[in-house]
């Protein structure tokens, strides 16, 4: 199992994960990141504002980014027909 650190970032600010979390595979890591981003977006929806400026960067113990998910890529929006 490898330890990864999930950092929440936008172009200005960042919220760093000092503890990290262990994952058995990259697939498990990707699923966790997707679930987490969607959970954060669900909270945004409940508050009436969706903020797509953010992303989660997963870094390994050496500090290399191994996976990034921008919030805007975590869901699909189906617009109302005109």
Regions found by a protein language model. Give the residues of each.
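A short, structured loop/turn motif at beta-sheet edges
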Residues: 1, 24-32, 60-64
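Short connector loops at helix/strand junctions that flank enzyme active sites
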Residues: 1, 51-53
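Short aromatic-glycine-(Arg/Gly/Cys) micro-motifs in beta-strand/loop hairpins
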Residues: 1-16
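Short loop/turn motifs at secondary-structure junctions and domain boundaries
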Residues: 14, 47-50
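A short, exposed loop/beta-hairpin motif centered on an aromatic-Gly-Thr core
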Residues: 16-24
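Charged, amphipathic alpha-helical segments
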Residues: 30-44
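C-terminal structural segments of small proteins and small subunits
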Residues: 53-82
């Amino acid at each position: 199992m490898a330890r990864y650190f999930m950092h929440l970032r936008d172009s200005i600010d960042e919220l760093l994960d000092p503890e990290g979390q262990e994952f058995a595979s990259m697939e498990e890591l990707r699923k966790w990141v997707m679930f987490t981003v969607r959970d954060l977006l669900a909270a945004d929806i409940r508050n009436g504002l969706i903020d797509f400026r953010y992303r989660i960067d997963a870094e390994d113990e050496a500090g290399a980014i191994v996976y990034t998910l921008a919030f805007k890529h975590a869901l699909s929006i189906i617009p109302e027909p005109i």
